Amino acid sequence: MTTIFDLLGKDADYLLNHKCVIKKEALTLPSGDLVSRVFAESDRNNRVLRSLQQMFSCGRLGGTGYLSILPVDQGVEHTAGASFAKNPMYFDPENIVRLAMEAGCSAVASSYGVLSILARRYAHKIPFLLKLNHNELLSYPTTYHQIFFSQVEDAYNMGAVAVGATIYFGSESSSEEIVAVAEAFARARELGLATVLWCYLRNPHFVVNNVDYHTAADLTGQADHLGATLGADIVKQKLPTLQGGFKTINFSKTDDLVYSELSSNHPIDLCRYQVLNSYCGKVGLINSGGPSGQDDFAEAVKTAVINKRAGGMGLILGRKAFQRPFSEGVRLLNLIQDIYLDPTISIS
């Protein structure tokens, strides 16, 4: 049987024994009492605390302070055909929820249509996270503009415990999206719902000399900081792959200490800088799994190890799981969860 160590391959020592530049003692780290220890001291009402605790208590990671969320909103974001042609069973929303339940996930995140059509059957069995806004791909030329497909009240009425939204920070529509999401999240808190923000970057000026800085630790870290500023309980971010975005794009501001004292080029240090920007871990960082490819198991394991050792709160992984046979999707999600359950894989 292939082990986590086998899947890490030549990177095993590099990832498992790294010591971070920013010490873990500077962070608020995931633990079973996280809701009581962190959020109970905030202005969040008791119903929000209950909703958060439902996610942190569900599935194989229940009681650990970590989350394993299955997100399937790609039918809107990337078109249904592109998302489900490899595995047509997921055109049926019920199989999305079944996958999350069978794999022992903390929650299932999807669109209003997917979750509402199954709410009476499943909302009391697994936490629902309603994704409120989406970017659709039928318009030409392609634009990056998140549009609300549903309202916070829809989440409340179907029995969801949380709402999610995306902001394309840096895009032409970012100011409009910030205002809309701030209003939606304020309403969600009134209704007792937890909030998760997809803190993505979209700006053509973030690509310089054919180098894409949309996954730079400094730029994505600032997006996380903006998400925390909006009051998100959890921020979702792509795993950082490089550093120095601010130094290259020639606008906005940074400090040389960011690169000399607060991070390095090691992937765990890059991810830790994201955690640092998420209020030193008080707002949980979950990283995304990315698209499906030939080495999904190895890539997913590395992403989980990096996130955990950096002080992150878990993974929100979709395409790698549902664009393969059902049983393999369950196995992949369980493998990721095993990393967060393994006490020998420690926070750096």
Swiss-Prot record:
Superkingdom, natural source: Bacteria
Active-site residue numbers: 236 (schiff-base intermediate with dihydroxyacetone-p)
Cross-referenced Gene3D superfamilies: Aldolase class I
Transmembrane parts of this sequence: none
Stored Pfam families: DeoC (PF01791)
A cellular component annotation (GO) from this entry: cytoplasm
EC number: 4.1.2.13
Keyword annotations: Cytoplasm, Glycolysis, Lyase, Schiff base
Principal location listed in the UniProt entry: cytoplasm
Reactions mediated catalytically: beta-D-fructose 1,6-bisphosphate = D-glyceraldehyde 3-phosphate + dihydroxyacetone phosphate
GO annotation (BP), single: glycolytic process
Subcellular location(s) of the protein: Cytoplasm
One Gene Ontology term of the molecular function aspect: fructose-bisphosphate aldolase activity
Family the UniProt entry places it in: Belongs to the DeoC/FbaB aldolase family. FbaB subfamily.
Entry protein name: Probable fructose-bisphosphate aldolase class 1
Gene: fbaB
